[in-house]
C-alpha cells in the first residue's frame, strides 16, 4: 500500500488487529438495535452468536462476502469482561497509579478496604463498558479526586497518604485522605 506521499508499506508480514462491537447487537424488527449477546451467556454461545451476526453483516447487509472471505477464520471473538477479570483490571490500574506517583513524585499512597470497595462496586456495576469503562471509573472516582486533593492541599512530592473514603455520589466525586 502506498500513501499519498509515496511511502510504501508491505503487509505481507504484518498482523492487523482491529476491534469492533459488530455482532454484539442486531437490528430489531422496528429498525432499532437489540442486544444479540449478554454477559450472562456462556462464552461458546457468545462466540457462535457473534460469528453468525458478523457473517450475516458482511453477506447480507453489506453484500460483500469477499471481505469476509479475505479475513477468513482470523476473527477472534472476545468474551465479556467477567467479574473476576474486572477485579484484576481494577487492581492493576490502581496499583499502576500508586506506583507511578511513588516513582515520579515520591508520594506513597495506600487505600482502605472501604474506599477500595467503592471502586470495586462501581467497576462491577456495569461490565458492558469493558476495560475502558473500568478505566473511566478509576479516572472519575480515584484519579480526578486524588489530583484535586493533592493540588488543594499543596502536596506535590514526598508524602505518605491513605485514602480512607471515596464519595462517588458527590458532584464531583471526592475522597478523604489522611497522612500516614
Segment roles from a protein language model:
Residues 1-180:
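AAA+ P-loop NTPase nucleotide-binding core of proteostasis motors
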Amino acid at each position: 500500500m502506498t500513501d499519498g506521499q509515496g511511502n510504501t508499506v508491505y503487509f505481507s508480514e504484518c498482523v492487523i488487529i482491529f476491534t469492533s462491537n459488530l455482532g454484539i447487537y442486531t437490528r430489531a424488527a422496528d429498525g432499532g438495535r437489540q442486544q444479540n449477546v449478554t454477559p450472562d451467556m456462556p462464552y461458546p454461545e457468545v462466540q457462535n452468536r457473534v460469528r453468525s451476526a458478523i457473517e450475516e453483516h458482511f453477506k447480507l447487509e453489506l453484500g460483500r462476502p469477499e471481505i469476509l472471505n479475505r479475513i477468513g477464520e482470523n476473527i477472534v471473538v472476545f468474551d465479556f469482561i467477567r467479574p473476576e477479570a474486572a477485579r484484576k483490571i481494577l487492581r492493576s490500574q490502581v496499583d499502576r497509579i500508586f506506583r507511578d506517583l511513588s516513582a515520579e513524585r515520591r508520594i506513597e499512597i495506600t487505600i482502605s478496604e472501604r474506599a477500595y470497595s467503592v471502586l470495586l462496586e462501581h467497576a462491577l456495576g456495569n461490565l458492558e463498558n469493558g476495560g475502558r469503562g473500568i478505566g473511566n471509573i478509576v479516572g472519575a472516582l480515584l484519579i480526578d479526586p486524588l489530583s484535586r486533593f493533592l493540588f488543594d492541599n499543596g502536596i506535590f512530592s514526598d508524602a505518605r497518604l491513605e485514602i480512607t473514603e471515596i464519595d462517588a455520589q458527590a458532584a464531583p466525586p471526592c475522597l478523604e485522605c489522611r497522612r500516614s
